[in-house]
Every structure is written in structure tokens, then in C-alpha cells.
């Protein structure tokens, strides 16, 4: 690289690799909990003040209650039979990442879109930081399709996706 190199990977610089198994247990339990459609007691896996950082259309939720009330409950109501399928997971100390898909029937209104009854697939990537057995940060990126070389986020791809699938 020409010139001075910007500092890289600051958040993972002091990762404690001895915490990898604990992180794995938290993430596996959380995904099972989401697939069991748990909402009220999902705090078993999330810090009370955790940050959920979604991409365009999803926004940012600060704290467990905001996540539950402004994302998890509306999403679950709109996709009542949804299941998360992580296709790959990576664990490194307090950090974990996954990519995969959610499969569901669009059974209720979501992001202003009336229920269509259609099956959908939402692709995602998640990155988590776990501290003291709880998720404190969750970065999320979702994409249902690619059009004209540009990723389409949940806010723009979901309406198109709901109109295409049968």
C-alpha cells in the first residue's frame, strides 16, 4: 500500500480466543431460540443494552426492548413460519459471524407491505460480539436479490421479492 496504512481490525485486536466455545454456545442457543419463535425471553442471549445494527430499511435498534418491539415482534408477525438457516458460521473468541437465509411465508404486513401469502427467502449476514455470555452487538446485512449490479436491501428487495415468488 502506498502511503500510511490506516489502522485495521481495531475491534478484534484484543480478541480472547479462549472465549470461542462460550461464544459458540450463545450463538447456537440464540439461533435455536429465534427458530422456536421466542421473543419474550430472548434476553437470555442478548444484553439489555445491546445494539442491533441493520442495513437500509431495517435501521438500528438500541436495547433489547427496542429490538423486540420494533423489529422482532413485527417481523415474526409478518413471517409467522419463518426459519433461519445459517449456511456457515465462524467463531473467533468473543466474535461470531454467519451467512444464510430465512425462509418464510409472508403472512402479515411488514414495512408497509400487505401480506401476500407467498413464500420468500431473505439472504443475510450477521456479525455478533458476545461479552459475559450475552450478545452486545449485532451487525446485520440482508439482501433478497441483485438488480442492475446493485444489492437490494430489505426495504427495497422485499417488495419486489414478494411480487415474484409463488
Language-model features: where?
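Short, low-complexity N-terminal intrinsically disordered segments enriched in polar/charged residues
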Residues: 2-48, 156-166
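Short beta-strand edge/turn micro-motifs at domain boundaries
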Residues: 4, 121-151
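A solvent-exposed, acidic/Ser-Thr-rich amphipathic alpha-helical stretch
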Residues: 21, 40-94, 101-103
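Short, structured motif recognition centered on aromatic/hydrophobic residues
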Residues: 23-27, 52, 75, 125-128, ...
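A structural feature that tracks compact, well-ordered secondary-structure segments
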Residues: 29-34, 70, 87-88, 129, ...
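A short, structured loop/turn motif at beta-sheet edges
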Residues: 89-97, 129-136
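Exposed beta-sheet edge and beta->alpha loop/turn motif
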Residues: 101-131
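A short, hydrophobic/aromatic-rich structural module that often spans a beta strand
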Residues: 104, 141-164
